[in-house]
């Protein structure tokens, strides 16, 4: 399953503009999540953070992406002591590019929101994607894929 990854330029919590096509590492993990500092998103982000060094051994960069502001990302990143950057996409450019900004239903109400999704990218191609994932255990599943690719 190889398809061209959507290129983007987004500001990171380290203050650097990240452009996908300029990243030199072998793998990039982009995980999209609904909202900073919420229970499921905290579980998923903490799990990626705990496994960060194992991803790094495989020349893999991790980026968490949401529509939250850079200021929100910075506070949350500091709180969780993240070893990787979060990317702010307030204009929803990458969220729409990866088709994770979509209509959702909750308690009979419809609204637009981010579907928790992850993409592994190699040489500007998507080699694996997960959509509508459960937060618990997902980071380990992504690491298993990278380790065995």
What residue spans do the PLM features occupy?
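Chalcogenol-based redox active-site neighborhoods
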Residues: 1-149
